[in-house]
Amino acid sequence: MAEVDTFLFTSESVNEGHPDKLCDQISDAVLDACLAEDPESKVACETCTKTNMVMVFGEITTKANVDYEKIVRDTCRGIGFVSNDVGLDAEHCKVLVNIEQQSPDIAQGVHGHFTKRPEEIGAGDQGHMFGYATDETPELMPLSHVLATKLGARLTEVRKNGACAWLRPDGKTQVTVEYQNDNGAMVPLRVHTVLISTQHDETVTNDEIAADLKEHVIKPVIPEQYLDEKTIFHLNPSGRFVIGGPHGDAGLTGRKIIIDTYGGWGAHGGGAFSGKDPTKVDRSGAYIARQAAKSIVANGLARRCIVQVSYAIGVPEPLSVFVDTYGTGKIPDREILRIVTENFDFRPGMIIINLDLMRGGNGRYLKTAAYGHFGREDPDFTWEVVKPLKWEEPSA
């Protein structure tokens, strides 16, 4: 029997105590607070952090009464940053706030100072965004990304529920999957390598770390069928990771954009999501592109798909929409593109209405800021709802 031609592909994730992810979560917690009181809020909120300090800065125009310092401390505390030992002390760290209003030049160009109807609202900036979907997992997401993300989420779960009391908030995961290319569709065969680097306290040995990670983190997350005697495990390979969080590394909003999306699969236009209200097409454009790509795969039009959309500042209609099914389409890509443009309204104001993106509160955007924006079962993730698409398979 001929040997199957395979390749290796790797995706990484970081969990909620990673300094960059801490910043994403603070930025989105600020966005939630603004939208909860004033759905028309215009938010571009950046966060940076280093030892004993968090700074929130950017442009925010809102009628909401927002206590930025409280949001910073609450978010840090919720993640588990409760002492300098673990990397940051939520109660006593310095919190700096430097927030200004949105530029009036941008405001008049995008929403005419709130005089425009939703379908007339222009894109908040230029740029291009991508959505991706693949039939290799029930979530219609790449397996390498799904496993890396779930390992990170599980690390946090066993830290917070006490199963692995030696864990500290910061941590990273990485999964290498061996794939077969089936005429453009991706078929995962096995997990080749699992890498976990997690912050830990002084009391635990490296052997205990490895044993606990295998038992409490890897076993519950990675399906048995993907693990074999050849699977390689790198568990805290550096040997020591006691200092972590903002004490170990500086953090910044928007530095984990591949972890937020598809783990290196598909493509990325470069625009981050967190801290941005939905008039920013970096966020809303990527969300509608995911819904379009996911709907194409879920409706059986293709096994794998990427959608690109692009915008000019102040212009409602997208400049371009592109669809590529990597040769897996049941009908030609140009037909699928026609179905997409007939079924999805890519104008920013209409994306906001159709995906209900102005609804804040309930930690809606905070939830997106760790463990990925896509492939998650949660009614707040409205862009994950599959749209039924009418199409006919060509007769043979």
Swiss-Prot record:
One cellular component (GO) term of this entry: cytosol
CDD domains listed in its UniProt record: S-AdoMet_synt (cd18079)
Binding site for Mg(2+): E12
Residues that coordinate or bind K(+): E46
Subcellular location: Cytoplasm
Chain residues that bind L-methionine: E59, Q102, D249, K280
First-level EC class: transferase
PANTHER family: S-ADENOSYLMETHIONINE SYNTHETASE
Family statement drawn from the similarity comment of this UniProt entry: Belongs to the AdoMet synthase family.
Function: Catalyzes the formation of S-adenosylmethionine from methionine and ATP. The reaction comprises two steps that are both catalyzed by the same enzyme: formation of S-adenosylmethionine (AdoMet) and triphosphate, and subsequent hydrolysis of the triphosphate.
This protein's name: S-adenosylmethionine synthase 3
Gene symbol of the encoding locus: METK3
